[in-house]
């Protein structure tokens, strides 16, 4: 992107992103399955002159993981040897903490930072030069071979590891499709967010496409509405969110639900607040999360419908 009136160029930051797997014709052939981690996506960039920086997938600098950066720098020459390059490289992965909420708080803190126990889970690698171009034509299977060969390096880094628990399936066969569903169930039961489905023959490309696909379960929760919040911006003067609180899945859940409504519903519900309060809403979410105070909330809650039978 070029800023007019100046002589410098603003770099565009990107990385490989996954498409949703539902209904995709690409869900055939040989695929690599791995757990979808519930952490912060991190691109650890090592420059040609041996400086390491952690970036978010949007290019925001993460300053709070120096222990990870230092461990990688301590093994920089070994990593270059396995990758067969002399310059910079990028480790693509996910930083994990004790919980997603705690990790996000620590990642953004300016002081009293406590990230020393976080672990960087690496699932891809590529030369920095190719990352800057937005494309590396090395097949996924070859990139994974590099990571596998690097196991002695990972063993030397207490807070940097390689994503484990992967399998290969052929989704063109009934056996492969059955294995995918069994694996997805196993990973979710183990506490992972879902699974990643990757094309073994695909290159690394810095954009969203079906080279990588993701599958996540959804959960429905039924909670009573205790009050309504007015919206802001274009939703000022009508419903912004339903404030819901109650017990479901054996947990005390409190959450504000601000999506899933049509404009007509926002207007109608706001005008009928006395009728809405006390009704039970069916809410779709990705996962039930625990707050620091021991209560629970929902990740990405969306209103589905009213459950007047409850």
Region locations from a protein language model:
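Covalent nucleotidyltransferase
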Residues: 23-157, 295
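Charged, flexible boundary elements
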Residues: 1-29, 33
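Structural detector for short beta-strands of small beta-barrel domains
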Residues: 218-234
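Short, acidic/hydrophobic/Gly-rich beta-strand patch recurrent on exposed beta strands
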Residues: 241-246, 256-258
């Amino acid at each position: 992107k070029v800023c007019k009136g100046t002589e410098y160029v603003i770099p565009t930051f990107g990385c490989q992103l996954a498409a949703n797997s539902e209904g995709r014709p690409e869900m055939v052939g040989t695929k690599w399955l791995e757990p979808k981690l519930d952490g912060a996506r991190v691109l650890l960039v090592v420059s040609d002159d041996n400086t390491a920086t952690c970036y978010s997938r949007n290019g925001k600098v993460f300053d709070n993981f120096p222990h990870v950066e230092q461990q990688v720098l301590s093994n920089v020459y070994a990593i270059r040897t396995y990758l067969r390059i002399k310059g910079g490289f990028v480790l693509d992965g996910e930083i994990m903490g004790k919980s997603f909420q705690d990790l996000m708080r620590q990642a953004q803190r300016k002081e009293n930072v406590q990230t020393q126990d976080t672990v960087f889970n690496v699932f891809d690698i590529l030369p920095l030069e190719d990352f800057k171009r937005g494309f590396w034509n090395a097949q996924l299977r070859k990139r994974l071979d590099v990571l596998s060969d690097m196991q002695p390096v990972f063993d030397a880094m207490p807070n940097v590891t390689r994503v484990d628990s992967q399998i290969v399936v052929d989704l063109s066969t009934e056996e492969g499709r059955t294995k995918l569903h069994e694996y997805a169930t196993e990973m979710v039961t183990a506490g992972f967010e879902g699974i990643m489905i990757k094309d073994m023959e695909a290159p690394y490309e810095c954009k969203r496409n079906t080279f990588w696909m993701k599958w996540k379960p959804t959960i429905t929760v039924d909670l009573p509405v205790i009050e309504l919040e007015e919206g802001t911006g274009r939703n000022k003067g009508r419903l912004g969110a339903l404030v819901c609180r109650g017990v479901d899945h054996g947990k005390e859940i409190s959450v504000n639900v601000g999506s899933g409504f049509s404009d007509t519903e926002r207007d109608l519900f706001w005008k009928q607040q006395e009728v809405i309060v006390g009704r039970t809403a069916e809410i779709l979410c990705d996962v039930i999360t625990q707050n620091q105070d021991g209560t629970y909330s929902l990740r990405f809650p969306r209103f589905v419908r009213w459950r007047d039978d409850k």
